[in-house]
Amino acid sequence: MTSKRIRFAAVGAGRVFQRYHLPCADARDAMDLVGLVDSDIERARELMADRPQVWTGTSVDRLIQETRPDLISVCTPNDAHAEPVLAALDAGIAVLCEKPLAATVEEARRMVAHPAAEKLLGVNMPFRFHPLLKPFADLVRSGAQRVEFSFATPGNRVWRACTPWYDDARRAGGGALLDLGPHAIDLLMAVFGPPVVEACEVDTPDLEQRVRVDMSFQGVPATLRIDRAARRLETSVTVTTADGDHVLDLRRNELRRANGTVEEAGQGPELAAISAYFDTVTGAATPHGKVSAQEALEVQLVVESAYGCARGVAAPLA
């Protein structure tokens, strides 16, 4: 474990930073928040009102010059990920980017291609760090006959983003599939490997709220359903085996086996990827505590392939 104090900064002072990244940083004695950038400078200043030592501004370059951070979180809208990530990598700074990696596959590829990306860039996709995922994977990986992933949320009616960019197709890059799909697809790929996308249906082009994706994992059929305008909360994956249905309920933090036994986890996965990456940088964990940019790109290529199916356009995973 390193004794060095980690100078932490962030780009984007909205809901994701406030609810996830900032509490994770504050929970670590080795991390000091030194800077915060936001396009709305008053928002950043108001948020840091009780932390006068924290530099605030609107320029990522100035942030790097003025605060000399060791670690930067990028919590901006999807179309504004690439610039701060690449600036951090150019400066040799560890950077944790929110999912998806970018609003477009082209921008995501540009980030992955940076020489420092493999070492320094991580992506916040937390479901693979859920404490029940390993026992679930051990239970279902070899005998899966059918996979169903259901993701339902009231979306922005509950989330209430500080900046209303989710309804801007250019900024978001997509709808519910690009917003929530990476969480589900990353978990499924962690268990079953890369999928083949066979069909995709969306309720509306560009900014879909509801989507169904049919895939297969080495011949095992799988369906992903996402509803970002639901009146309920559900995040669960059900795998059918010869023994029956095994359910990993990420909302209730339960693994419900086909034999009726239930295993519970003490905490949910929401902060897991951020915590793992922060612990990697501070030296509290091994260097394996992150989702790499390459892995995030592979997930985004699955999303792009699904969008291609919905449009009737071939989008191979390459």
Outline where the language-model segments fall:
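Short, conserved SAM-binding/catalytic segment
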Residues: 46-53, 111-116
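Predominantly a Rossmann-like dinucleotide-binding segment in NAD(P)-dependent oxidoreductases
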Residues: 127-196, 313
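C-terminal helix-rich "cap/oligomerization" subdomain common to oxidoreductases
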Residues: 1-2, 62, 71-73, 218, ...
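Rossmann-fold dehydrogenase core element
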Residues: 108-126, 144-149
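Hydrophobic residues in well-ordered beta-strands that form the structural core
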Residues: 96-97, 121-123, 248
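N-terminal Rossmann-like dinucleotide-binding module
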Residues: 1-51
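Beta-loop-alpha module in the N-terminal Rossmann-like domain of NAD(P)-dependent dehydrogenases
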Residues: 40, 55-112
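Contiguous beta-strand/loop segments that form the cofactor/metal-binding neighborhood of enzyme cores
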Residues: 185-254, 275-285
